[in-house]
From Swiss-Prot:
Name of the featured protein: UDP-N-acetylglucosamine 1-carboxyvinyltransferase
Family of this protein: Belongs to the EPSP synthase family. MurA subfamily.
Molecular functions per Gene Ontology: UDP-N-acetylglucosamine 1-carboxyvinyltransferase activity
The organism's taxonomic lineage, starting at the top: Bacteria, Pseudomonadati, Pseudomonadota, Alphaproteobacteria, Hyphomicrobiales
Enzyme Commission identifier(s): 2.5.1.7
Gene: murA
Length: 431
């Protein structure tokens, strides 16, 4: 099993290319099920979750072809993948595939829209709280679907097709918004979605669906109107840059100090995160090619900042663990409140193995900053927790080994390569 070995204490200098966003790529790939024509996606990252979804789509009869492009300057591949769902061969999504990644459940929307039936296993993915699919199922019911849960599977039917409806999400849900957009795109009539997610990844999907012939208005807001069309066609769409990856590397630079350009990072998708990081002492300059980050540890200490996670444009829950790692070396005390998922502090126990001082009280963590952390062997519990341990280890004295890094491979493309090119002492090892 692979592990990541890190010797901390090195400042970073260089350029880190930001990959395409996993959270945008997955729904765009699933949207290819909606048309028999070819959907071409540019800037697809090399990630375990992407490869798994390719297998799932292939299970439904989706053909694909990959164009690989390599930048000699960045030494990171970017890919274009052509997906063609000329004929859906099955509406059955088995447990052995869906259990590995929660987003794979989203195929229920396009399958129901195009084939009027779907038989999909209840999902898996990172073990963060319950993350119920109730909002998705209730939304599909409003579009006229009949839903039954049998032996761990959702059996959805709409023999006469889906019909436009009005649905108010009880709670903001990115996955639920993705599914309802795809299901309603070809429904008979107009659908109004209220309290919808307005994340950049949702906007990316709306733009893709509109490029395929859908009629969706309201992008970037919580109220979306979908005028159903009879048929969608092929299109070419580029996956947006990964704001979570960009935010993560920004926190790495804030933690270790250094001088780094985050190439292709979109500052408009990180407004609140960048405001918070500036308060911690990170110097941020927006340039045409991305974000230029600097911190001199001798001149600027890490300052504590309190945060509360929330739906976009608030501070993203997917950067909470990384920010907590940064605060472990702040000059004072910081409070971090998680409002999106319960049980998303599983990284705390492992951070304390590196010397962090953290107190938990319900959904709030109080972090008591320390001057130094100490390297140690640690265990990743989920995707974002794993990268928080990387951040802490990069600043810790001595050697750390992070185990179970398969979590890391689900969401970060070639992390050790990108960091090593900027001077970090980091390598993948097999133990």
């Amino acid at each position: 099993m692979d592990s990541i070995q890190i010797v901390g204490g090195k400042k970073l200098k260089g350029t880190i290319p930001i990959s395409g966003a996993k959270n945008a790529a997955l729904p765009l790939m699933i949207a290819a099920l909606l048309t028999e024509e070819t959907v071409t996606l540019d800037n697809i990252p090399h990630l375990a979750d992407v490869e798994l979804l390719i297998r799932i789509l292939n299970n439904h009869g989706v053909g694909y072809a990959v164009d690989g492009q390599k930048s000699h300057h960045d030494c990171i591949d970017s890919r274009t993948i052509h997906f063609t769902a000329q004929k859906i061969t099955t509406t059955y999504a088995p447990y052995e595939l869906v259990r590995k990644m929660r987003a794979s459940f989203w195929v229920i929307g396009p399958l129901l829209a195009r084939c009027h039936e779907a038989y999909v296993s209840l999902p898996g993915g990172c073990a963060i709280g319950t993350r119920p699919v109730n909002f998705i199922l209730e939304g599909l019911k409003t579009l006229g679907a009949r839903i039954a849960i049998e032996n761990g599977y959702v059996h959805a039917k709409a023999p006469k097709g889906l019909k436009g409806a009005h649905y108010h999400f009880p709670k903001v849900t990115v996955g639920g918004t993705h599914v309802m957009l795809m299901a309603a795109a070809t429904a008979n009539g107009t659908t109004l979605l209220e309290n919808a997610a307005c994340e950049p990844e949702v906007t990316n999907l709306i733009q893709a669906l509109n490029a395929m012939g859908a009629k969706i208005t309201g992008e970037g807001t919580s109220t979306l109107t979908i005028e159903g069309v009879k048929k969608l066609h092929g299109a070419r769409i580029s996956v947006i840059a990964d704001r979570i990856e960009a935010g993560t590397y920004a926190m790495v630079v804030a933690m270790t100090g250094g001088n780094v350009l985050l190439k292709n990072a979109n500052p408009h998708h990180l407004t609140q995160v960048l405001e918070v990081l500036q308060k911690t002492g990170l110097d941020i300059e927006i340039k045409p090619q991305g974000l230029h980050l600097k911190r001199n540890p001798r001149q600027t200490k890490i300052m504590p900042v309190n945060i509360k996670t929330g739906p976009y444009p608030a501070f993203p829950t997917d950067l909470q663990a990384q920010f907590m790692a940064l605060m472990t070396r702040a000059q004072g005390t910081a409070c971090i409140t998680e409002t999106i998922f319960e049980n998303r502090f599983m990284h705390v126990q492992e951070l304390t193995r590196l010397g962090a001082q953290i107190k938990l009280d319900g959904q709030t963590a109080t972090v008591y900053g320390r001057e130094h952390l100490q390297g140690a062997p640690v265990m990743a519990t989920d995707l974002r927790a794993s990268v928080s341990l990387v951040i802490a280890a990069l600043a810790a004295k001595g050697e750390s080994v992070i185990n179970r890094v398969y979590h890391l491979d689900r969401g970060f493309e070639r992390l050790e390569e990108k960091l090593a090119r900027c001077g970090a002492i980091i390598q993948r090892i097999t133990v």
